[in-house]
């Protein structure tokens, strides 16, 4: 975690705006925690963007957990709840909706960064998505 913190600290400049995609899971909460620590030193502006996928009994509880954490730490909280999914591949549709929401929030705040926490499987998914779209891996 020290290496991740140091990387983020070196990456982000004073007074930049960072949108954090936060599910409420351990990876995204660790990212939000680290960015909040950096905020106290570099005076960055943090916006937490949470998507309630509305698919599990605890979805609302997760949303409230993240919302309350942000409130306790004076972080702007933006959320959306997905009410209905189509008949297509659920994971693809959820991902498309989630990143459209993140893009909207980045534009709303004119953010310098959108940050999401990835574990190994997520990272592979990101690499594959970039290859399919013809993007670079940087």
Task: Describe each PLM feature range.
Residues 1-22, 26-138:
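Core alpha/beta nucleotide-donor-binding catalytic domains of modification enzymes
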